[in-house]
Amino acid sequence: MLLTVYCVRRDLSEATFSLQVRPDFELHNFLVLCELESGIPAEETQIVYMERLLVNDHCSLGSYGLKDGDMVILLQKEAMRPRSPERAAGLCSMEPAGPALPGTSGSRPHQRAQSAQHSSRRGSGEKAGPGQGLDSPALVRSMLLSSPHDLSLLKERNPSLAEALLSGNLESFSQVLMEQQRERALREQERLRLFSADPFDLEAQAKIEEEIRQQNIEENMSIAMEEAPESFGQVAMLYINCRVNGHPLKAFVDSGAQMTIMNQVCAERCNIIRLVDRRWAGVAKGVGTQRILGRVHLAQIQIEGDFLQCSFSILEEQPMDMLLGLDMLRRHQCSIDLKRNVLVIGTTGTQTSFLPEGELPPCAKLVSGMGPEESSDKETANAIKHSVMDSGRKKH
C-alpha cells in the first residue's frame, strides 16, 4: 500500500514523501524508512494517524487501520535539554495569546518542549507540587530577578509577565505565569490536532494556512531584527530653528505636507492672528482632520540670516507650532540633505542644521519626562530589594 508522510521537523520546516509498504510492516521498520527519507533519526520521530499517536513499535501498520492512500503525520520530538537556569531565559520569550513579539520565534521549540514535558507529567499522574524544582513560580521569580539580562528580555518580549514580576506580588506573578503556560499548551494541542486532521477538511486547512502565514511573519521579523535592527527604532523628525516677527520657533520640515501651517496659539504669540483672512476657512485632511481658521497671505520667516516670504494656514488645534510645507519649500527651492543633516535654502545657498532630539519641542520628543528605561530600572531595583529582604526574613 502507498502511504503519504507529512513531516514536521523540530525547526518547523516541512516535507512530504510517499512510501510503498505492506500492511504487515511493523512500525519500527516504518520509522527506519522514514529516517532514510526525512533525515530525522528514528528514535526522535512520532507517527500520528487520525489524531492518534502510534506508540507500539512492534505492531503492524495494518493493525492501526492504515490502508492504501492514507496520510500520516511524522513529528520530530523536541530536544530534551537538562533542567538548568536556561529555563528562566525561556520564560522571557513566553508570549501571551496575542501576536508574537520580536525575537520570540527562535525560542519556540524550547517552549514546546516545556509544554510537552508538563503534559507528559500530567498524563502519567505525576503531581508537580508548587515547590518542585524550576516549576516553582517563586524560584522562577527569584532567578529572573537575579539575572538583569533575562529581566530586560522579559520586559521587552513579555510585558504582562514582567509587570507581574516587578509588582513584588508572588501570587500575581504565579497566576500570570500559569495562565500563559496553560494558553501555550492549548495552542500546542490545537496545532497537533490540525496536523493530524482530515487533509480534505477545508476549515482545518485554512487554520494550518493561517499558522504557516503567522510563522512566516515571525521568521521575517526575526531576520529583520538580526540583519536590520535599526528598522525597529524610532526616528526623530526634522525640525529647524527659525523666527517669525522676532519670536523664536521650532518649525517642523515636512515635504509631504501641501501647505505651511501654524497653530492658533503660535499665531497669537507671534502677533499675526490679526492678519488671518477667515474667507479661507476650511478643513485640513490628512491622518486626521483639523479646522482651518483662515490664512495669513504674507508674512516673513527668518532662517539663519535669511528673511523669506511665507504664507500660513492657521489651524485651530495643532500640537506643533509651525510646519513648513511643500509650498514654502518649493518657492525657495529648499533641499533636505540628510547626509549632512541640513536644510539648504536653494535661492540663497544658506544652510541650517536640523535639531538634535534633545532640542526638539515636547510634542516631537521620542521620550518625554522620565523615560521608560529610567522608570523600569527603578521598578527593577525596588523588586530586587524586596526579594532580598524576603529571602533574608526566611533565613532568620
Curated annotation (Swiss-Prot):
Enzyme class: hydrolase
One GO molecular-function entry: aspartic-type endopeptidase activity
UniProt keyword Cell wall biogenesis/degradation present: no
GO biological process terms held by the UniProt record: cellular response to hydroxyurea; proteasomal protein catabolic process; regulation of DNA stability; regulation of protein stability
Pfam families membership: Asp_protease (PF09668), Ddi2_HDD (PF24669)
Segments for region (Disordered): 84-137, 367-396
Domain of life: Eukaryota
Biased composition (Basic and acidic residues): 387-396
Keyword set includes Hydrolase: yes
Gene3D superfamilies, sorted: Acid Proteases (2.40.70.10), Phosphatidylinositol 3-kinase Catalytic Subunit, Chain A, domain 1 (3.10.20.90)
Domain Ubiquitin-like positions: 1-81
InterPro entries: DDI1_N, Peptidase_aspartic_DDI1-type, Peptidase_aspartic_dom_sf, Ubiquitin-like_dom, Ubiquitin-like_domsf
Family that this chain belongs to: Belongs to the DDI1 family.
PANTHER family listed in its UniProt record: DNA DAMAGE INDUCIBLE 1 HOMOLOG 2, SODIUM-GLUCOSE COTRANSPORTER REGULATORY PROTEIN -RELATED
Protein name as it appears in the record: Protein DDI1 homolog 1
Organism: Bos taurus
High-level lineage: Eukaryota, Metazoa, Chordata, Craniata, Vertebrata
Annotated gene: DDI1
